[in-house]
């Protein structure tokens, strides 16, 4: 389970508030995970545990899934403030 210490922190990286950055963030995370899986070749158990955690986070639709934005989840109120997000 040594390889999980490199995979689990990826789930804690927050998604940006600005919707314009969601695509680039998801592409970066996808390429990072793909390159990690190809280079490090984690054991089967670690890969299954990580994929199960990723599936549960994305299935729960709490807004932390980096693959897509759930339509039912709402953005924080600060996301609509132009002073914080910028133009």
UniProtKB/Swiss-Prot annotation:
Its job: Acts as a tumor suppressor; induces growth arrest at G(1)/S checkpoint and apoptosis via RB1-dependent and p53/TP53- and NF-kappa-B-independent mechanisms. Modulates expression of genes involved in the regulation of proliferation, cell cycle and apoptosis.
Predominant place of localization: cytoplasm
Mode of membrane association: Multi-pass membrane protein
Protein name as catalogued: Apoptosis inducing factor BLCAP
InterPro entries hit by this protein: BCALP (IPR009598)
Taxonomic lineage from the root: Eukaryota, Metazoa, Chordata, Craniata, Vertebrata
Family label: Belongs to the BLCAP family.
Coiled-coil region: none
Domain of life assignment: Eukaryota
Keywords, alphabetical: Apoptosis, Cell cycle, Cytoplasm, Membrane, Nucleus, Transmembrane, Transmembrane helix, Tumor suppressor
Subunit structure: Interacts with RB1 (phosphorylated and unphosphorylated). Interacts with STAT3; the interaction is promoted by cell stimulation with IL6 and phosphorylation of STAT3.
Subcellular location(s) of the protein: Cytoplasm; Nucleus; Membrane
Transmembrane residue ranges: 19-39, 43-63
GO cellular component, as recorded: cytoplasm; membrane; nucleus
Provenance organism: Didelphis virginiana (North American opossum)
BP GO annotations: apoptotic process
